[in-house]
Regions:
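Sec-dependent N-terminal signal peptides
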Residues: 4-13
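Sec/Tat signal peptide C-region and signal peptidase I cleavage site
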Residues: 15-19
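N-terminal amphipathic, basic helical "cap/leader" segment at the start of enzyme domains
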Residues: 20-132
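A short, structure-level motif marking secondary-structure boundaries and short turns
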Residues: 22, 148-150, 206
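Small-aliphatic-rich amphipathic alpha-helix that forms the alpha element of a beta-alpha
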Residues: 44, 63, 91, 134-186
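A glycine-rich helix N-cap at a beta->alpha junction
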Residues: 191-206
């Protein structure tokens, strides 16, 4: 079953399923995040080596939900705090098969590119980052009308980043928050407008 799920994700990302660029994620397994907060905080580490073990779509769904998924469908509240409740952090899921954008409200992944951009995420100084099977790229949106400066996007990215750390710890996985990346290449590959800012990235694996 796990291999089938991974294969389905690969097909979506590479465009092998021509008529469908959106995949509905499995419901997150919140029960898998049952480690106590105290234990998660004690065990949380920044890890910089990863095995070749793939990440299932089910596990990815759980991590994305913990990052900034919808925690209360009635109110639209998400798992991470957000300045002025803008909920502006976009999470791009990057793997060898391409890039997808996470839609928290729909619980879906939308294909953005079929290219492997993990080398640009790693940058020149930290090649270990491109060995992780998946990297999450956190992007904020600048809004000059509501945000007088860029600190609010950085704050929101920090909240999401901590959630990713704690979720990976609870799931027995590895991650590290990084600000180093090839900003110019990534902005081009992700087709980001000038109002978007690359905040952080999280290589994730085992």
């Amino acid at each position: 079953m796990k291999k089938i799920i991974i294969f389905a994700l690969a097909l979506i990302m590479t465009g092998s399923i021509q008529a469908q660029d959106v995949i509905t994620l499995p419901q997150p397994e919140v029960s898998k995040l049952s480690m106590s907060l105290g234990d998660a905080l004690k065990q949380r580490r920044s890890m910089r080596s990863f095995s070749e073990q793939e990440i299932s779509l089910q596990t990815l769904s759980t991590i994305l939900w913990a990052a900034c998924g919808v925690s209360d469908p009635k109110t639209g509240k998400i798992t991470a705090p957000s300045a002025i409740n803008m909920q502006d952090i976009k999470v791009y899921v990057c793997s060898k098969d391409g890039v997808c954008l996470y839609n928290a409200k729909a619980n879906t992944l939308t294909k953005v590119s079929g290219k492997d951009i993990r080398e640009a995420i790693a940058g020149k100084m930290q090649p270990f980052a491109k060995t992780a099977p998946i990297s999450l790229v956190l992007v904020s949106t600048k809004d000059s009308d509501r945000f007088p400066n860029d600190k609010y996007g950085a704050m929101d990215a920090g909240y999401v980043s901590q959630n990713i750390y704690l979720a990976c710890t609870a799931l027995g996985m590895k991650t590290v928050a990084r600000a180093m990346m090839d900003y110019d290449t990534l902005k081009q590959e992700l087709n980001l407008p000038e109002t978007s800012y690359l905040e952080l990235n999280h290589p994730i694996g085992y």
